[in-house]
Amino acid sequence: LLKDEALKPKQKAQVKLIEQKAENMSDLIAQLLFLSRADQGRQQIEKENVNLSELTEMIVGEQQFLAESKGNAGQIICHIEPEIWAEVDETLYIRMMINLLSNALRYGEGRDIEVSLSVHNDSDIIGKVKDHGIGISKGDIPHIWERFYRADKSRTGGSHCGLGLSMVKWIAEAHGGSVEVVSKEGEGSEF
């Protein structure tokens, strides 16, 4: 419809809005189905040996491109050790990183974001996503992993319904890892 020459600018804007809302609804349904399968122990994990360094850089590049196309001026700065390999479900890792990066971009207020990936003690892989944005209040931090919880109630709408961090937590734990947050209001958050 958007390519239809007969549509007036206002009609094209309305069609574009409808398409965006449909995409948001599709994302929400996919997240709910994922978490439902996880609750029932039916969410499959298909691990394979993956170069996390290259995969993380690819995800960062895609998210940077999307952010720039939406007018976000901040840069994603990478500190990624080369050749970090691990047995992971590539699709779930991508989903986890996109959730963390999209949150950092959304709440980072256009400031730079830092992504790091390193190995400690020869086997522990540590990944971090840090923004310098609005941060999370101390009172909200214990609840951010809960489904549908939104620390920033003033930012509503879109496809952001408070499921992303519960998915991040599930994915990390399903791979034998964990996720934590350090945050201070007005200074940003690090996951």
Where are these regions (language model features)?
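Short alpha-helical segment of the dimerization/phosphotransfer core of two-component systems
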Residues: 20-25
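Short helix-loop "hinge" at the ATP-lid/N-box region of the Bergerat-fold HATPase_c
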Residues: 104-105
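Conserved catalytic submotifs in the C-terminal HATPase_c
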Residues: 46-49, 73-84, 120
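Short acidic helix/loop segment immediately C-terminal to the autophosphorylated histidine
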Residues: 2-9
